[in-house]
Amino acid sequence: MFEQTFKNIDDILHKDAGCTSELDYTEQSSWLLFLKYLDALEGDKANEAALEGKPYRFIIDPAYRWDAWAAPKTASGTLDHNAAMTGDDLRDFVNAKLFPYLAGFKQRASGPNTIEYKIGEVFSEIKNKVQSGYNLRDVIEHVDELRFGAQAEKHELSHLYEAKIKNMGNAGRNGGEYYTPRPLIRSMVKVSKPRIGERIYDGACGSAGFLCEAFEYLSSQPGLSTADLKTL
């Protein structure tokens, strides 16, 4: 599912005047994927809190959540085309309101180790390059189809993101310098022999390839207990 969606997104961005390279395709799809994933994560946390009878404070204000500006839904769960922005309205909202709001988290955060600060840092460094709001609407609708609930889906996303980084390198852009092939990662994990309960640190985490392969290595060990699985 992810592979075809990524291809569809790249085809749309290829037609946009503001996106001229593999680097642009990766960057522009990444910030949308980030916001979609963040929205799903907040939804899961809110549901968990509700089951425990606890309140949950959303990081993102209502007007800037995914289901408000990107993909408002009808009562049946389908995209509400009457409420969804498109064209110049969508592009102008993203450029003039969404990005400044998200970048502002860097100043509003309580410290550099908070997720709020990291959101602000990300959106202080990038900008929306998609010039056509209609192209942006099409890309958003493809991103909205993605789901990140299962571990296998997260691993597939990691693999495909690494492939995009590799393509950046093949196209002569410096982003590919930081791509580590999966076979090499697997070999390094096997040599290091991580154990459940140990802290696994990837100091240069990009697509989380090392972390994903460490998880695969640990989860494939024989005789795992319930406590081990909970730790994983």
Which sequence ranges carry the predicted segments?
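Conserved S-adenosyl-L-methionine
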Residues: G175-L232
